[in-house]
Design a protein with these regions (language model features):
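Active-site microenvironment of metallo-dependent hydrolases
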Residues: 1-5, 9-20, 47-69, 73-74, ...
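Active-site metal-binding motif and surrounding structural segment of the metallo-beta-lactamase
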Residues: 16-36
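Metal-coordinating catalytic core of metallo-dependent amide/deamination hydrolases
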Residues: 75-181, 200-211
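Histidine/acidic-residue-rich catalytic or RNA/ligand-binding cores of hydrolases
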Residues: 82, 164-173, 194-203, 220-232, ...
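Phosphate/diphosphate-binding loops
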Residues: 97, 101, 128-140, 183-201, ...
Length: 371
């Protein structure tokens, strides 16, 4: 792979790479390592977090192969966020932070003023490197009024689906009827027997071009033993909650654009362990699909202008993670159709073997912005 000025310029064979390398190129031999796009977090709330806590989060996720983060914060959280980014950039280089402004319970005039106040931090010569404002986050009942603000400011509209998916989906679909070009997403969605993510809703979201961010976190534990049991059941897709794998599989079948890791909690399971869980679940999805929902799907959820961001293609940002792995294969959730293949004509990426007996990949390094 040839990287220049922070962008992927070419991907091909070893022989092709050697033929185009010249004295100006710095050559890194992979020695059997695996290169993948760095992982991206779909939504992580930093409200009420001080700068050291935000910095700890960014560093912990960097060690797990993450570079891009969509962070949910209020105006009062911005100073701590900027401080954390300054420390992080000095040690690791500039991160890729997509900020969604929490506008729940915020009056329209106050929201417009907040967006104007953030513009110098994200757009002009005084801007914080790596920080961009991409959207506003509201409750379902606030979506109609916020949609006008988002459209006028050229921002996406994120609707909170953590407490009621049906209400959030209905609100998003209603907004779409009057605003055909507004970027709309549902965040922190889960499916429960009382509030299911139905196939009908998934089809409607796909047809309306509304993206879906699925939560992968367990609900925060309450003090009672029963609530703790329910929290454990939820992550496994027990009686209290449909598994993430099952929802993702149905969303893929409906053609709904999804991303994983859109959560109401700051910390979520790491990407490789999550992919392994999704592949090995009885209602699982392929490793390729799970990987895409933690990379390319996150950028689509953020309505990235370049549709190929999150994969290795010419003129995409070079957010590259290098991993040490034991073996690669094409993996499907059904072991009867899993197969070993190295034929590039199949255009199916080989990913690390992720069965329960295999070790997870170990991060060796991250390359970003040519660093």
């Amino acid at each position: 792979m040839l990287v220049e000025d922070g962008f992927v310029r070419w991907v091909g064979s070893d022989s092709g790479a050697r033929s185009i390398a010249d004295e100006s190129a710095t050559i890194t031999e992979l020695d059997g390592a695996l290169l993948t796009p760095a992982f991206a977090r779909a939504l992580a709330p930093v409200a009420g977090k001080e700068a050291p806590e935000i910095l700890d989060y960014l560093q912990a996720y960097r060690a797990a192969g993450y570079h891009t983060h969509t962070l949910l914060a209020g105006m009062e959280d911005v100073p701590d966020l900027v401080s954390a980014l300054s420390y992080y950039s000095a040690e690791h280089g500039v991160p890729d932070i997509r900020l969604i402004l929490n506008a729940t319970c915020v009056e329209t005039d106050e929201l417009i003023s907040a967006i104007k106040a953030l513009r110098p931090l994200t757009e002009d010569e005084r801007s914080v490197k790596g920080l961009q404002l991409v959207g506003i986050f509201v409750a379902p009942t606030e979506a109609p009024a916020a949609a006008q603000v988002a459209e006028d400011a050229a921002l996406l509209l994120s609707i909170d689906a953590s407490t009621s998916f049906a209400n959030a989906a209905d609100a998003a679909l209603a907004v779409r009827e009057t605003r055909p070009w507004l970027s709309i997403r549902l965040d922190a969605a889960i499916s429960t027997p009382q509030d299911p993510i139905t196939d009908e809703y998934l089809t409607q979201l796909a047809e309306a071009r509304i993206n879906l961010g699925l939560s992968v976190c367990e609900p925060e534990e309450d003090e009672t033993a029963n609530d703790t049991v329910q929290a454990l059941l939820a992550h496994a897709g027990g009686e209290a909650r449909e598994s993430v794998a099952s929802v993702a599989r149905r969303a893929n079948a409906a053609g709904t654009s999804i991303a994983l890791g859109s959560d109401a909690q700051l910390y979520a399971p790491g990407a490789w362990s999550l992919i392994r869980e999704l592949v090995n679940n009885e209602h699982g999805i392929s490793a390729r699909s799970a990987f895409a929902a933690l990379t390319r799907g996150v950028y689509r959820l953020a309505h990235e202008e370049n549709p190929f961001t999150g994969q290795f293609a010419p003129d995409t940002p070079a957010f590259v993670a290098q991993w040490r792995v034991e073996a690669l294969m094409v993996q499907a959730p059904d072991s009867r159709v899993a197969s070993w293949s190295t034929d590039p004509r199949a255009r199916i990426p080989l990913l690390p073997v992720l069965d329960e007996d295999s070790p997870l990949p170990i991060l060796e390094s991250i390359y970003t912005e040519s660093n």
